[in-house]
Swiss-Prot record:
Residues 606-615 have a biased composition (Pro residues). The keyword Phosphoprotein applies. The lineage of its organism: Eukaryota, Metazoa, Chordata, Craniata, Vertebrata. Regulates the dendritic spine distribution of CTTN/cortactin in hippocampal neurons, and thus controls dendritic spinogenesis and dendritic spine maintenance. Associates with the striatin-interacting phosphatase and kinase (STRIPAK) core complex to regulate dendritic spine distribution of the STRIPAK complex in hippocampal neurons. Residues 119-276 form a coiled coil. Residues 1624-1638 have a biased composition (Low complexity). It comes from Rhinolophus ferrumequinum (Greater horseshoe bat). It comes from the Eukaryota. Signal peptide: none annotated. This is Cortactin-binding protein 2. The modification Phosphoserine is found at residue 1524. Interacts with CTTN/cortactin SH3 domain. Interacts with STRN, STRN4/zinedin and MOB4/phocein; this interactions mediate the association with the STRIPAK core complex and may regulate dendritic spine distribution of the STRIPAK complex in hippocampal neurons. Activation of glutamate receptors weakens the interaction with STRN and STRN4. One of its GO terms (cellular component) is dendritic spine. The modification Asymmetric dimethylarginine is found at residue 498. The keyword Repeat applies.
Length: 1663
């Protein structure tokens, strides 16, 4: 039957083939396959394929059915479990019932079929086994190949090390050459410094010699001046004696003449003549001989023009009739002054006050031919400076006066006729005229002039004058004598002028203050010509350059003679008025018109005891009302500065004075100002000058003198600030104190304009008119306000001056003060209640004037200063209601107070339609415009007459201000929502960061607002994710959709405007301006998508880990279920795990699953039973009999490094991989029970390990988890810290990317560099357990403009975190090596001295190399912080002085201590961190320290030096030893710390000497040597920079020769000191955890020994 079944199978197997063939034949008959299209072919193939599949199914079904029928028929009656029993039953049944036939043909065939099947299966299994064996053999062959490759790799590695050694040797040679070159450079620099020092010394010597030379010059000048002074005094005395002789001779001649006359009179009396009434005695007529000729109101008068060398011209008067017996003496007149000369005379003023000649009778005057009086148009003197068409001649100008205006000379008997044109007329500006203006004139010379000019009228002790004989009738002899005596007197004056004037050709000196001044004047508008030879040296002034000798001087006589008026009819013709012989001259034309009154205090001399001490005044020409001087004894105030004021002069448009007369009997020479009646009686001046009062009666003997000249003098005193003179004039009765000149200037006006407060007070007390205006309408208050005299303004307002008075042009005092920017005056006027709204004729208000000048303070006062109650500000210097803080400080009023001016005044337009804002904008006064814009009522859209707005006329800066005028500034901030990372301190992490300030204007639309928000976010993300300090322009130019960290506008979840939610692109009915104002939104907050939305954008922004990296981590967790994050401590492992768990939780919740997060802190006491309970309680471990729960669990095991992971997780590794009920495991609970459990399929396990690398048994766990390594030198950790600190800086700068030059930015870059350099050094040091993540540096403070705070923070971090970790890592490594080397069971509680030395050396290296390198602080500031760092004072030369000797001989390595100053004790290097155990005697004996004598003292043996060392205090810093060889490996680690990777940095370190900080524990400490005999490892190049920061001195042994001893400073390169053979063959291998490569060096290798210290001295030790 088996054969039948077998035969049937082929039939069925062929059935599908037959069917397919039939179908194909039918298809060929029906259609042609080649003619079908592609779609029809596809359809045909699919139909045929379906038929084939259906046929196969039918065949299989028929076969199965046939097989079932066959078995049922054959074995249906039997149990087929055991075929042998069935076979036995068949036989039994067959024996019993032979008639029955068995169903099966042969049961044995069935058994054979079964056995054949078994054999087939056995063959198949053998085949598979053979294949497995072949695979195993192949695997073994691969292993052999791998071993061969490893051997080859080792060979290559060894060859590579050899090449590195060769390269290192080459580098050492190059470094040696570099060091030599650097030494040469230092020598050249030292030479250059010496040369520069010598040059400085030479310069100092030269300057000292120059000072001595100048001192000698001054001394010689003083001596020469004194000699000149003595010569001039001698000349003066000679001329005095000569003049006295001439006077005596003249007097003798007069007496003879008088005798003759008396004889004639006796004869006449005898004859009984009737002429007695007409011949009166001189004493009777003496009091009537002084004639005062009035001007302006009287009839025409002749002018007498004469020089002292010219014939005398008689002048007559037709108006004032005198008796016939009164003769009038011809007087010396004033020269005519040209129209272009500066003067101050009124138009109709005659300039001469003629005296009375006793020799001429009235009949002679009448009988004489009278000259024609020139018309006013011809004699008028131009006022207020020269005319526009002619300028004054400064040398020798002759005025263009027509000959008809000159009075003809009268012919007198005996007098030579001389025309007026022959007299040289000089301008007042000529140097010759100026030459006689000598305020510093020698008092003896002045006395001589007084003596010769007024000796006949000198008062005696009783105040009486010497009297002359009575007058005689006119005779030719007397006229001749008159001319002769006049010539004699002129000759004396000419002689005196020769040495009182300057040398010929000497120009006048401008701006030199007179030595006799008491008041201090600025040199504005001032010119004074001093006599160089006789300056007042007692005032402290340096002696001037001496003039030429008077005897050699060729200066001509003064062309403008002294004007003298005869006072007494009884005088001799040769006697003149007693006046101060000082010629009046005007200043040069370059000066502004103004009276110059120069105070000179003349001290009495022993040679002239008859002259009492009296002040003398020289008057120069200036406009009346503008003279600014006073008596030296009564000077009040200072010369007012030349400030912008009124456009017109003080008096009128043309107002200058011509000096015409000299006051009688006084040292004061007043100029007649605006009046020609200055010749009136000056009794007040006589009294003021200190002369006897009896002279007043004598001077006024001609009758009562009118007060017409008094107002002029009053104005002069007020303008000059002469308080004494002014008070005397005010006490005079009948004086009109309100008198004003032609221009309307009163005395009060002049005093107020020139700022003489005391004069203003005197005039106001005298009831002067306070509001008297000039012809232009300006009052004294206007003048004071315009000139800025706020004291005068205060006085005038106190006396109820009209503060709102308007001049002819509408100018008020407030307007004038604003126009000139006088802040104090504006303040006083506003407090007095001045009206701000008064307009001028041009429509300008005071606000227009203030803005026009651009004075911000004036504008602020007008805008914000309110007027207090009237009358309370007079005695308050600073009213409390006034404006404070005009400089814009914290007290600035515009920030708190509201403007007091109305909107109408702000928008007031002038005649052209311009407002104050138009003026400020057009002139570019941005500050003024900003103040105006703060007023709510300002209308910037107001148009002027040309239809232009403020914006149209504004400059670019002002346009920008106007465009942002009404911008609503609102901050845009980013919020990270619920992301509150536990890795950040609360103070270090900002939940919200201000990224920019949005300017919302009225015309801003919602589309613009959306674009602005999106653009701001994009720029911010680009800025914080960039590699450097990008500016916003760079960010905009580099604009992309997303930043490098994956954030963009799509990362925003929502935006809130204040408290109202808003999304980008959304619009409201109101504009953004109105919406934000209405809702009082203070900020715009942007919330990023976070884990709640199943997104990681907020986590990316908070941690600054790129979004793609976080998404990759999340994918790993979801895919592998078991993930561990590991990295150095502080690498944010816990934070990343927690945030990923949150994101997964919210994703599962969104998918409809419940999810739970379980966090567990693992410590050393955490057992696997507790972990099992945790898994069971969180439904992570499920009992076998229990069905799994429908929720997902996320378990986070934090800090797994604190326990043994192999012990803790060992029992859970297999169940974690096979999570199903089929593979349960038995776990023990914490309560002692146990059970079978399996892990939930949807359980996620995450762990965190704060360890850089795994060691030992923990490696067994590694293959069962997916590990995510967070390396400090790879992404994402490498860029996290710079990005985080950069974002903090942007937040501190209010969203603006700061400049890289900012100290705060430099501190940020430095902090990030410290973190990288520190980890780099720790890696090479072989202490990976001391590596730090960026967490500790995230708290770095960022303060704009300051870096000191960052340095202090770094010091605290170093002392609290970094230094303890480094110490612990190095000591733990040392203890591990000690345990491995000597199998010690107990570790020392305190580290050995060698270990402490290694720790200190490591800290010093790290501090100098990693932390302080590149600090942004200057060297001086950084030195102040170095003492606060731990480990910065360790002498690194000790590290390299360790000698490694053979272990077999039992010799220990020693620390050699060398001190150049054995008297100095220890303590130069402080190390407060570690304990210093006292060394016992045995330990001391074990130390074989030897002292090397730098002074070549070879007599001391090593034993004595050792005993000397032991007798002194033994400290850890100076005397260190190593008791075993394990410290040698640590020293080896230190020396090879910077071996290979830092070779390229040596040039960088050597060049950046400013960045390299050296820390000396003491500036004057003895330094240490580094003499090395045997050392196994060289010091690498990069180790140089920190090691060279300590002062060491190289000392040789007693036989070596030291070099010059000059220390070479500022050397950054190590110098190989000696070649030494290294005796150690066996070097210890470092632990497996060390990343530092150790090199085995044989006995014959030679290495360079590095000498590393600050002051390097290269010495060659004896071999």
């Amino acid at each position: 039957m088996a054969t039948d079944g077998a035969s049937c199978e082929p039939d069925f197997s062929r059935a599908p083939e037959d069917a397919a063939g039939a179908t194909a034949e039918a298809a060929k008959q029906d259609f042609d396959v080649d003619a079908l299209s592609k779609s029809e072919l596809r359809m045909l193939l699919s139909v045929m394929e379906g038929e084939l599949e259906a046929r196969d199914l039918v065949i299989e079904a028929l076969r199965a059915r046939r097989k079932e029928v066959f078995i049922q028929e054959r074995y249906g009656r039997f149990n087929l479990n055991d075929p042998f029993l069935a076979l036995q039953r068949d036989y039994e049944a067959g024996a019993g019932d032979k008639e029955k036939k068995p169903v099966c043909a042969n049961p044995l065939s069935i058994l054979e079929a079964v056995m054949a099947h078994c054999r087939k299966m056995q063959e198949r299994m053998s085949t598979q086994l053979a294949a497995a064996e072949s695979r195993q053999k192949k695997l073994e062959m691969e292993k052999l190949q791998l071993q061969a490759l490893e051997l080859e790799h080792k060979k290559l590695a060894a060859r590579l090390e050899e090449e590195r050694g060769k390269n290192k040797h080459v580098v050492l040679m190059l470094v040696k050459e570099c060091k030599q070159l650097s030494g040469r450079v230092i020598e050249e620099a030292q030479k250059l410094e010496d040369v520069m020092a010598k040059l400085d010394e030479e310069k100092k010597k030269t300057s000292a010699l120059e000072e001595e030379l100048s001192t000698e010059k001054r001394r010689s000048t003083d001596m020469e001046a004194q000699m000149e002074k003595q010569l001039s005094e001698f000349d003066t005395e000679r001329e005095q004696l000569r003049a006295k002789l001439h006077r005596e001779e003249a007097h003798t001649a007069d007496l003879k003449e008088e005798i003759d006359k008396m004889k004639k009179m006796i004869e006449q009396l005898k004859r009984g003549s009737d002429s007695k009434p007409s011949l009166s005695l001189p004493r009777k007529t003496k009091d009537r001989r002084l004639v005062s000729i009035s001007v302006g109101t009287e009839g025409p008068m002749t002018r007498s023009v004469a020089c002292q060398t010219d014939p005398v011209i008689e002048s007559t008067d037709h108006v004032k009739k005198l008796p016939l017996t009164v003769p009038v003496k011809p007087s010396t007149g004033s020269p005519l002054v040209s129209a272009n000369a500066k003067g101050n005379a009124c138009t109709s003023a005659a300039l001469v006050r003629p005296g009375i000649d006793r020799q001429a009778s009235h009949g002679d005057l009448i009988g004489s031919s009278l000259p024609t009086v020139p018309p006013p148009s011809a004699t008028r003197v131009e006022e207020n400076g020269p005319s526009t068409d002619s300028a004054p001649d400064l040398t020798n100008s002759t005025p263009p006066v027509p000959s008809s205006t000159a009075p003809p000379a009268m012919q007198t008997p005996g007098a030579a006729p001389q025309s007026h044109s022959q007299a040289p007329l000089h301008s007042l500006h000529s140097p010759s005229a100026n030459a006689s203006l000598h305020p510093g004139l020698n008092p003896r010379i002045q006395a001589a002039r007084f003596r010769f000019q007024g000796n006949a009228n000198d008062p005696d002790q009783n105040g009486n004058t010497t009297q002359s004989p009575p007058s005689r009738d006119v005779s030719p002899t007397s006229r001749d004598n008159l001319v002769a005596k006049q010539l004699a007197r002129n000759t004396v004056t000419q002689a005196l002028s020769r040495f009182t004037g300057p040398p010929a050709g000497a120009p006048p000196r401008h701006g030199v203050p007179p030595s006799g001044d008491v008041g201090t004047y600025p040199p504005v508008g001032r010119t004074n010509v001093k006599t160089p030879g006789v300056a007042r040296v007692d005032r402290g002034n340096p002696p001037p350059i001496p003039p030429k000798k008077p005897g050699l001087s060729q200066a001509p006589s003064p062309p403008h003679p002294q004007l003298k008026v005869v006072m007494d009819s009884s005088r001799a013709p040769s006697a003149g008025a007693k006046v101060d012989n000082k010629t009046v001259a005007s200043p040069p034309s370059s000066l502004p018109p103004g009276n110059r009154v120069i105070n000179e205090e003349n001290l009495p001399k022993p040679t002239t005891p008859q002259l009492p001490p009296k002040p003398s005044i020289d008057l120069t020409v200036a406009p009346a009302g503008c003279a600014v001087s006073a008596l030296a004894t009564s000077q009040v105030g200072a010369w007012p500065a030349e400030t912008p004021g009124l456009n017109q002069p003080a008096c009128s448009e043309r107002s200058l004075v011509i000096p015409t007369t000299i006051a009688f009997c006084s040292s004061i020479n007043p100029v007649s100002a605006s009046s020609c009646r200055a010749g009136a009686s000056d009794s007040l001046l006589v009294t003021a000058s200190g002369w006897s009062p009896s002279l007043t009666f004598l001077l006024m003997s001609g009758g009562p003198a009118p007060l017409a000249g008094r107002p002029t003098l009053l104005q002069q005193a007020a303008a000059q600030g002469n308080v004494t003179l002014l008070s005397m004039l005010l006490n005079e009765e009948g004086l009109d104190i309100n008198y004003s000149c032609e221009d309307g200037h009163s005395a009060l006006y002049s005093a107020a304009k020139n700022g003489h407060t005391d004069c203003v007070r005197l005039l106001l007390n005298a009831e002067a008119q306070v509001d008297a205006a000039d012809k232009n309408g300006f009052t004294p208050l206007c003048a004071a306000a315009a000139q800025g005299h706020f004291k005068c303004v205060e006085l005038l307002t106190a006396y109820d001056a009209d503060i709102n008075h308007t001049a002819d042009g509408g100018q008020t005092p407030l307007y004038l003060a604003c126009k000139n920017g006088n802040k104090e005056c504006i303040k006083l006027l506003l407090e007095a209640g001045s009206d701000r709204s008064v307009k001028t004729s041009d429509g300008w208000t005071p606000l227009h004037a203030a803005v026009d000048t651009g004075n911000v303070d004036s504008v602020k006062l007008l805008m914000y200063h309110s007027a207090p109650a009237r009358g309370h500000f007079l005695h308050e210097e600073e009213p409390e209601s006034g404006v404070c803080g005009l400089d814009g400080g914290e007290g600035s009023p515009e920030g708190t107070a509201k403007p007091v001016v109305p909107a109408d005044l702000i928008n007031q337009a002038d005649r052209e339609g311009w407002t104050a804002a138009h003026i400020a904008a057009s002139k570019g006064f941005k500050n003024c415009l900003e103040i105006l814009c703060r007023h709510a009522g300002l209308e910037p859209d107001r148009r002027e007459k040309c239809n232009r707005t403020v914006h149209d006329v504004a400059t670019d800066d002002c346009k920008h201000l106007l465009e942002n005028l009404h911008a609503f500034k609102i901050p845009l901030r980013i919020s990270v929502g619920e992301v509150q990372p536990d890795i950040y301190c609360s103070d270090d992490f900002e939940c919200e960061n201000t990224i920019c300030i949005l300017n919302i204007r009225k015309q801003t639309s919602w589309d613009d607002f959306s674009k602005a928000v999106s653009q701001a976010l994009t720029n911010h993300f680009q800025a914080i994710s960039s590699d450097g300090w990008w500016s916003l322009e760079d960010v905009t130019c580099n604009n992309t959709a997303d930043s490098s960290i994956g954030l963009g506008a799509s990362s925003v979840r929502s935006v809130t405007l204040g408290n109202v939610p808003w999304s980008v692109g959304q619009s409201f009915a109101q504009s953004p301006w109105d919406f934000l104002r209405k809702n009082k939104a203070e900020q715009v907050s942007v919330l990023l998508s976070g884990p709640q939305e199943g997104c990681l954008s907020s986590v990316t922004y908070a941690s600054l880990i790129p979004l793609q990296v976080l998404q990759n981590y999340l994918r790993l967790v979801e895919q592998y279920h078991n993930v561990i994050f590991h990295g150095p401590e502080g690498s944010l492992q816990n934070y990343i795990a927690h945030q990923l768990a949150l994101c997964m939780k919210h994703r599962q919740i969104a998918a409809g699953f419940s999810c739970e997060i379980v966090r567990a802190q693992v410590d050393a006491s955490f057992s696997k039973e507790q972990l099992a309970d945790l898994f069971i309680s969180s439904a992570c471990l499920i009992p076998v009999k229990q069905s799994p729960v429908n929720k997902k669990i996320i378990i986070i095991l934090e800090n797994l490094e604190k326990s043994s992971m192999s012990e803790l997780l060992g029992d859970f590794l297999a169940p974690l991989e096979n999570r199903s009920p089929e593979s349960p495991c038995t776990f023990h609970k914490g309560n002692g029970t146990s059970g079978c459990y399996y892990f939930h399929e949807h359980c996620f396990l995450m762990g965190t390990v704060a360890k850089a690398c795994l060691q030992g048994s923990d490696l067994l766990v590694q293959q069962h988890f997916r590990w995510v390594q967070l390396r400090w030198d790879g992404e994402p950790m490498q860029s996290l810290l710079p990005r985080f600190l950069r974002r903090r800086a942007v937040n501190k700068f209010r969203g603006q990317v700061p400049s890289p030059c900012d100290p705060g930015c430099k501190a940020v870059d430095w902090a990030a560099a410290v973190w990288r350099q520190l980890n780099s050094c720790l890696t090479r040091l072989g202490t990976p357990e001391a590596l730090l993540g960026p967490k500790y540096f995230l708290s770095c403070p960022v303060i704009p403009g300051h870096a000191q705070v960052t340095v202090k923070w770094m010091c605290k971090l170093w002392n609290a975190v970094i230094a303890p970790r480094v110490q612990e890592a190095i000591l733990s490594r040392a203890s591990v090596e000690r345990h491995a080397g000597f199998a010690q069971t107990t570790a020392k509680k305190t580290p050995s001295q060698g270990q402490q030395a290694v720790v200190k050396a490591a800290l010093s290296i790290l501090l100098n190399k990693a932390v302080l390198h590149g600090c942004p602080l200057p060297r001086a500031e950084l030195d102040q912080h170095t003492a606060d760092f731990k480990g910065g004072s360790f002498p690194l030369s000790i590290v390299s002085s360790y000698n490694c000797c053979s272990k077999k001989k039992g010799e220990n390595g020693t620390w050699r201590k060398v001190s150049t100053s054995p008297r100095k004790k220890s303590g130069h290097f402080s190390s407060p961190t570690w304990n210093k155990p006292d060394l016992n005697e045995e330990g001391i004996r074990n130390t074989t320290t030897s002292q090397l004598n730098c002074n070549r003292n070879a007599s001391l043996s090593k034993q004595k030096s050792l005993e000397n060392d032991l007798s002194s205090t033994l400290t850890l810093d100076q005397k260190l030893y190593l008791g075993s060889d394990d410290e040698a490996d640590l020293i080896k680690e230190l020396q090879s710390m910077c071996s290979s990777k830092s070779e390229s940095d040596i040039s960088k370190i050597a060049d950046s000497r400013d960045d390299l900080r050296r820390f000396d524990s003491s500036r004057n400490n003895p330094t240490f040597s580094a003499t090395v005999n045997n050392l196994r490892m060289p010091v690498s190049e990069k180790e140089v920079s920190p090691l060279s920061s300590h002062q060491t001195t190289e000392c040789n042994d007693s036989k070596s020769k030291t070099e010059s001893g000059v220390s070479r400073v500022k050397s950054f390169l190590p110098v190989p000191q000696s070649k030494a053979t290294l005796c150690s063959q066996n070097t210890k291998r470092s632990s497996s955890s060390s990343n530092t490569r150790q090199i085995e060096i044989n006995n014959n290798s030679k290495e360079e020994i590095w000498n590393l210290h600050k002051n390097e001295q290269v010495e060659k030790p004896n071999k």
